[in-house]
Each structure stands twice: as C-alpha cells, then as structure tokens.
C-alpha cells in the first residue's frame, strides 16, 4: 500500500455534543453521489446556499459518520472542502457507533449565494493491501447529524434567499400547502402552481408537499395562497401594507411557525 502522507495542519476539529443554545443544524440536500464514501479515495459534494448575513458570520460545519472496522484510523482521513479549499481534516475513528465532530469554517470561505461543500475520505485497510480489500473500505455520513451550524436568530426573510431554507434530516424540503377559505379545485390548482414556482425559485432538490394547516418546526416552508381577506385570517399581513393587487410576502420563521410565504 501507498505510505500515508502527514496530514496538513488545521484548527483541531471538536467532538460535537448537543447543539449550542440558539443554534440550528442546517442539513444537506440529497445529492447524486449519496452519503456513502467507499474505496480508498471517495468524495461527495453539495451545493449550499448562504445569505449575505450568514456568509459574514463565523460558521461551523458538523459531520456525523460511521466507518467499517477494516478502516485503519491512523492512516485514514475525512476532510472538508469549501469552494475547493480544504478547511479541516480528521482521522476516521468511528467503527462501532456514529461519531460527530465540528470544524470551524474560516472567515470569507463562504460567499453569499451558492457554495461547494465537499467531504472526501482517504481510507487505508488495517491488514489487507489487495485490490479486493478496497471493497471493504467505507465511511457512511449520517445526514441527520451533518450540516452547517447556524444561529436561530437569522431566519430567511427575503424571497431571493429561499435557497437558504433548511431541508429536514432526510434531505427533503417540506412544503405545507395551506388553502385558506373554501377548498375547491380552483384553489388547489392555484396553490399547486405556486408550489412549483417556489420550488424552482428556491432550487429545492427534493420538495415534499402536503396540504394542511399552518405547520411549525425548523425545516421547510408554509405556502398560503388566496385572497388577502382569507390569508389575513391565518397570518399577520400588516407588514405588507395596503394590498391593492397580487402580492408575495415572506414571514420569517419563529418558535410557533416555520417560514411562511
């Protein structure tokens, strides 16, 4: 086998415990490569959108993972790259249960808009250097424990920043379609068209739509479509001012309600 190279020096990753007070874990979307890193060298990458305000903050990235018992911890690494720059590296040491760690993302590494986030595994076998043994090397990323750690005090407040909405732990973006007033075919068709529009505008990789009352929670979005008199019975429209024609309003998430459009 190839001799392992010494790891570059980064700020030491920290074992993650409970989320810090006031923080929320922004999960990653499902991607083509998936969450399993198999073989000696493997990587998986996500496009991640951050707002201008978020990009200016010190942000951490949390990773939850589990690896095969055949992976040699002393010569195997999991590295995090942001926009093609490696910002952290840790030995792979999670052979019996899922472990989590956090890496500080340096200032100015993230830019307002879409960014590339990549996890790369370099894996060496404990005892076997044969080609067949490489099929025994794998690291599984736990999507429920992986993503950006962001302040709860910075919810999405602009339509332009819809791509910054957080998916759920399975990587899907829940959309709760709310039909105020009478439920008829015309209203349902109208809200389904609006659902398609926000999914395209927000570039949601995996939108999951259901219909019901306004929903709470940290992930996803409520979508309410209807006459102002009906919509106003469900949400506070005072911030919209006088409504004399079609309007789009985004209400930031709060402890009672997820982000609402």
Q: What is the role of each PLM region?
A:
Residues 1-261:
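Solvent-exposed alpha-helical segments and adjacent loops
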């Amino acid at each position: 086998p190839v001799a392992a190279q010494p790891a570059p020096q980064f700020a030491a990753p920290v074992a993650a415990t409970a989320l810090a007070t006031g923080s929320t874990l922004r999960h990653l979307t499902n991607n083509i490569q998936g969450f399993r890193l198999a073989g000696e060298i493997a990587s998986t990458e996500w496009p991640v959108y951050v707002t201008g305000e978020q990009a200016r903050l010190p942000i951490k990235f949390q990773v939850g993972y589990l690896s095969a018992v055949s992976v040699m911890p002393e010569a195997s690494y999991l590295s995090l790259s942001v926009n093609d720059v490696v910002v952290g590296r840790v030995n792979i040491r999670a052979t019996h249960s899922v472990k989590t760690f956090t890496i500080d993302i340096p200032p100015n590494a993230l830019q307002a808009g879409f960014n590339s986030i990549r996890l790369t595994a370099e894996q060496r076998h404990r005892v076997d250097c044969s080609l067949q043994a490489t099929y025994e090397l794998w690291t599984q990323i736990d999507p429920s424990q992986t993503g950006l750690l962001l302040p709860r005090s910075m919810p999405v407040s602009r339509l332009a920043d819809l791509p910054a909405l957080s998916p759920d732990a399975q990587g899907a973006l829940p959309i709760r379609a709310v039909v105020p007033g009478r439920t008829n075919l015309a209203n349902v068709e109208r809200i389904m068209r609006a659902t398609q529009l926000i999914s395209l505008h927000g570039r949601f990789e995996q939108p999951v739509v259901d219909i019901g009352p306004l929903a709470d929670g940290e992930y996803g979005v409520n979508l309410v479509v209807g006459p102002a008199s009906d919509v106003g019975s469900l949400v506070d429209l005072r911030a919209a001012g006088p409504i004399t024609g079609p309007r789009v309003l985004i209400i930031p998430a709060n402890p009672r309600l997820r982000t609402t459009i």
